[in-house]
C-alpha cells in the first residue's frame, strides 16, 4: 500500500507528515526544514519558484511574488506574479506539489493520496477549491480535516485524558476555535467558530501602520519594495518581543531613516481591537457548544501565531489558566494529520481512534 501523507496547507507555512513506525513523523523539505513557506514567485523568464526561495523574493521582487493567497481560496480572485494570472487554488497546488515531492524523496516511494487540513470556518466552495488544488498537484485528496480538529487529535493522543478541550488555532491568516470532547478513543468536535481574515499577519500590518502614523508618513509614499521591507521589520519586531522586553524598529522611506521603540505593553495597547475580535470568536465557540470558560479543562495552542507571548498572555487572562503549548505550535496540526493517516491505513496502535469532525456551514 502506498503511503498517505497529511498536508497542513497553511496561509504562511505548509508542512507534510506521515504515519510510520508507530508515530506521526514530520517530513523535511529540500532545505532540511519542516516548514515550507506558502509563497510563489515568478522569475523574469517565467519560471515559478515555490517555498523559501520564493519567500526571499518578497523583499527583492514584491511585484512578482505572492503570499497569503490561501485566504482567497474559492473566491475567484486571481493573482498576477508575472505575465500570467493564477487562482489561489492554482498557487496552492504548487505548494502541495512541493510538499508531495519532498515526501517522495524522503520516503522513497510514490505518493498519490493526501489528507489536507483547512480552517474550520472554510465554507463549501473553499473546501472544493482545496480538493481542486490537490487534483492540480496530481494527488487525490482522501479527506479534508478541520485544522483545530487535527490539533485536538494530536493533543489527545499524547495526553490520553478525558476532558473538555478548547483548541485555539491561530495561524498567519486565520483564527479557528474548536470545543472538543475527548473520551476513550473518541475525539468529538462539539462546536467551531472562526475568522478567516484574522491572523498573525494582521499584527505585522498593525505595527507597520502605527509606525508610519507615528512618523507622519502616508502609506502612499512608500514604494512596493519599501512597504515589503517595512512589513518584514514589523514581523521581526513582533518575533523579537517574544525574547526581549524592548525592541527598536528601523525603516527607511525615501532617504529618511525612522525608528521607534516597542514594548509588550505598547503592543498590547495597539492590539486591543484585534484582541477583541479574538475574544468574540472564542465567545461564539463557547455559546454554540453550550459551555462557559469554566467548563474548559484545557486550552491547546496551535498555529504559528499562537506562539506570540501577547496571545498566550491574553488566553491566560481569559481562561484564568495557562494554555498548553505542546512542542512547536507550527507542527501540531501536521502531526494530527499524520495520525489521521495512521487511522486511515488501519495502523494497529491507532486504528480504533475516531475523529468526528463538523462543518459550520450547510453543504
Positions of the model-derived regions?
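Oxyanion-binding/catalytic loops of NTP- or PPi-dependent enzymes
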Residues: 1-75, 79-85, 94, 101-363
Amino acid at each position: 500500500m502506498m503511503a498517505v501523507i497529511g498536508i497542513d496547507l497553511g496561509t504562511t507555512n505548509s508542512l507534510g507528515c506521515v504515519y510510520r513506525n508507530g508515530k506521526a513523523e514530520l517530513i523535511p523539505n529540500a532545505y532540511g526544514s519542516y516548514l515550507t513557506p506558502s509563497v510563489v514567485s515568478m522569475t523574469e523568464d517565467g519560471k515559478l519558484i515555490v517555498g523559501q526561495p520564493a519567500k526571499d523574493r518578497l523583499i527583492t521582487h514584491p511585484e512578482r511574488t505572492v503570499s497569503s493567497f490561501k485566504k482567497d481560496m474559492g473566491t475567484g480572485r486571481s493573482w498576477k506574479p508575472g505575465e500570467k494570472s493564477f487562482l489561489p487554488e492554482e498557487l496552492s497546488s504548487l505548494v502541495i506539489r512541493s510538499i508531495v515531492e519532498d515526501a517522495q524523496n524522503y520516503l522513497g516511494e510514490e505518493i498519490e493520496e493526501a489528507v489536507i487540513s483547512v480552517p474550520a470556518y472554510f465554507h463549501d466552495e473553499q473546501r472544493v477549491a482545496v480538493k481542486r488544488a490537490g487534483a492540480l498537484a496530481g494527488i487525490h485528496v482522501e479527506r479534508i480535516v478541520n485544522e483545530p480538529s487535527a490539533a485536538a487529535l494530536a493533543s489527545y493522543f499524547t495526553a490520553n485524558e478525558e476532558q473538555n478541550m478548547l483548541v485555539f488555532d491561530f495561524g498567519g491568516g486565520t483564527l479557528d476555535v474548536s470545543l472538543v470532547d475527548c473520551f476513550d478513543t473518541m475525539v468529538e468536535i462539539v462546536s467551531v467558530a472562526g475568522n478567516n481574515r484574522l491572523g498573525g499577519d494582521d499584527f505585522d500590518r498593525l505595527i507597520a501602520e502605527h509606525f508610519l502614523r507615528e512618523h507622519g508618513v502616508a502609506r502612499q509614499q512608500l514604494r512596493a519594495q519599501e512597504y515589503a521591507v517595512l512589513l518584514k521589520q514589523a514581523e521581526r519586531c513582533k518575533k523579537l518581543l517574544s525574547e526581549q522586553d524592548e525592541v527598536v524598529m528601523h525603516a527607511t522611506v525615501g532617504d529618511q531613516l525612522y525608528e521607534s521603540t516597542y514594548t509588550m505593553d505598547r503592543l498590547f495597547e495597539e492590539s486591543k481591537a484585534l484582541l477583541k475580535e479574538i475574544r468574540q470568536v472564542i465567545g461564539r465557540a463557547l455559546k454554540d457548544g453550550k459551555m462557559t470558560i469554566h467548563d474548559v479543562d484545557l486550552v491547546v495552542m496551535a498555529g504559528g501565531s499562537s506562539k506570540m507571548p501577547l496571545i498566550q498572555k491574553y488566553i491566560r487572562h481569559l481562561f484564568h489558566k495557562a494554555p498548553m503549548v505542546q512542542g512547536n505550535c507550527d507542527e501540531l496540526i501536521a502531526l494530527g494529520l499524520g495520525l489521521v493517516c495512521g487511522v486511515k491505513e488501519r495502523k494497529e496502535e491507532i486504528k480504533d481512534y475516531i475523529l468526528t469532525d463538523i462543518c459550520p456551514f450547510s453543504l
